[in-house]
């Protein structure tokens, strides 16, 4: 990672691995992580330890086999369950014990999803966010938050979506990534929303886009123009349904078109080779 002022965050090993027909072994994930480290991404999300046995094994093996020079590993997981303290939740404990210096938590930011999917109150969801971030920070880990379905939630209840962002920041999250989970946003509306959230909360914002409307890369780039300093995506745009924002295209757009260095120069010169090397592992064309 060049410095902490701008994050390139890869989620190939977790979100990208959800693509139909893509079945990565632990050994595959270790190889891909080494390629991403060559590129010089800031963070590599390794998976969900505790919830997915293969990902638990990845973090165990990574501790002894993965010598990252440029990137840092991140563990992905959820906030604590309703009615259970973060210190008593075994899935939160698995994040703590993963060995990853960074944890990215996913949390509901759409009021209807809190009520219908989590089957809890809006207040308890905020408490879950606060408690989990506070606990992991106390354990010495850096915490990012993925605000799931944020843009749909902001349309439905902007006040509550903003409460989620504020709760995360006040608890100690370094970044709140706004997620276009359904991939339905258009660039103009997305950029306007990012600006509004930044102005209302003062949070350091990230962006996580899916490509269902073929706007994943464009939406990521306009989010940066609107103030986001943390971009998420996957190698070759891998991901469920239509895929995630192609992180290689995002990096090229930022560095070659907009003049913003986000990975080392030797990394970007090798990006085409790295894209094809990863496709050899996944057996999915770039």
Show the residue positions of the predicted features:
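Catalytic cores and adjacent flexible loops of soluble metabolic enzymes
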Residues: 1-286
């Amino acid at each position: 990672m060049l410095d902490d002022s701008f994050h390139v965050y890869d989620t190939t090993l977790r979100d990208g691995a959800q693509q139909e027909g893509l079945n990565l072994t632990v050994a595959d994930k270790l190889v891909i992580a080494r390629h991403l480290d060559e590129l010089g991404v800031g963070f590599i999300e390794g998976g969900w330890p505790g919830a997915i046995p293969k990902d638990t094994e990845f973090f165990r093996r990574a501790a002894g086999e993965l010598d990252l020079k440029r990137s840092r590993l991140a563990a992905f997981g959820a906030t604590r369950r309703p009615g259970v303290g973060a210190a008593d939740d075994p899935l939160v404990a698995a994040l703590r014990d993963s060995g990853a210096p960074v944890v990215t938590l996913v949390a509901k930011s759409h009021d209807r999803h809190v009520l219908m999917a989590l089957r809890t109150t809006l207040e308890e969801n905020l408490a879950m966010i606060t408690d989990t971030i506070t606990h992991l920070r106390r354990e010495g880990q850096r915490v990012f938050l993925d605000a799931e379905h944020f843009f749909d939630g902001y349309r439905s209840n902007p006040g509550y979506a903003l409460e989620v962002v504020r709760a995360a920041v006040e608890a100690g999250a370094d970044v709140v990534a706004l997620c276009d989970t359904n991939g339905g946003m258009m660039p103009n509306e997305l950029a306007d929303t990012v600006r509004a959230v930044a102005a209302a909360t003062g949070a350091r914002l990230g962006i996580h886009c899916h490509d269902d409307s073929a706007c994943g890369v464009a939406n990521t780039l306009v989010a940066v123009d609107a103030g986001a300093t943390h971009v998420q995506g996957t190698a070759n745009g891998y991901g469920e349904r239509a895929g995630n924002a192609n992180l290689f295209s995002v990096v090229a757009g930022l560095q070659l078109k907009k003049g913003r260095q986000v990975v080392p120069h030797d990394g970007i010169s090798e990006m085409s080779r790295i894209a094809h090397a990863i496709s050899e592992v996944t057996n999915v064309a770039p």
